[in-house]
C-alpha cells in the first residue's frame, strides 16, 4: 500500500526535522552510503565522498512514511535530498551543478 500525503503528519515532520538536525550534512537517499540503490543517490554520495564531506545517509526505502513525507516536507518531488546545516540544498542535479561550479 502506497502512502500519499498532501499534508504532512506532525509526527512524521518531527521525525524528519530530528534527522535533519542530527548532523551538519544529511542525505535522504535510496539505499545506504555504502550501497546506494539508485543512480541518483549514488551520484550524490560520490560527490560528497570525493570532496571529503562527512554525512549521514537516511535510507528512505526502509520507511515509507519518511520516503513520502520528505517530499512533502521539502516540497521537492524526488529523492535524493541533501540538507546542509538544516537547509535543503536540492537533489542530484543541483548537487552535481554545485560541485561542477565550485
What are these regions (language model features)?
Residues 1-5:
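Short, Lys/Arg-enriched N-terminal segments with co-localized hydrophobic residues
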Residues 6-10:
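Short gly/ser/thr-rich secondary-structure transition/capping motifs
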Residues 12-14, 67:
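Eukaryotic intrinsically disordered and solvent-exposed regulatory patches
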Residues 16-54:
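Local sequence-structure signature of Cys/Sec-based thiol-disulfide redox active-site neighborhoods
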Residues 28-30, 58-63, 85:
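Structured beta-strand/turn binding interfaces of compact recognition modules in eukaryotic regulators
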Residues 47, 72, 98-101:
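Rhodanese-like catalytic fold shared by cysteine-dependent sulfurtransferases
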Residues 49-68, 77:
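Thiol-based oxidoreductase modules, predominantly thioredoxin-like and allied folds used
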Residues 84-102:
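Non-catalytic, surface beta->alpha helical segment in thiol-disulfide oxidoreductase systems
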Amino acid at each position: 500500500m502506497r502512502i500519499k500525503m498532501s499534508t504532512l503528519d506532525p509526527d512524521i515532520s518531527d521525525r524528519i526535522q530530528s534527522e535533519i538536525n542530527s548532523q551538519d550534512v544529511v542525505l535522504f537517499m535510496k539505499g545506504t552510503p555504502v550501497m546506494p540503490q539508485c543512480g541518483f543517490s549514488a551520484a550524490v554520495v560520490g560527490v560528497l565522498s570525493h570532496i571529503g564531506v562527512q554525512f549521514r545517509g537516511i535510507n528512505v526505502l526502509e520507511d515509507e512514511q519518511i520516503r513520502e513525507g520528505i517530499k512533502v516536507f521539502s516540497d521537492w518531488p524526488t529523492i535524493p535530498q541533501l540538507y546542509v546545516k538544516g537547509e535543503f540544498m536540492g537533489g542530484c542535479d543541483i548537487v552535481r551543478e554545485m560541485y561542477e561550479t565550485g
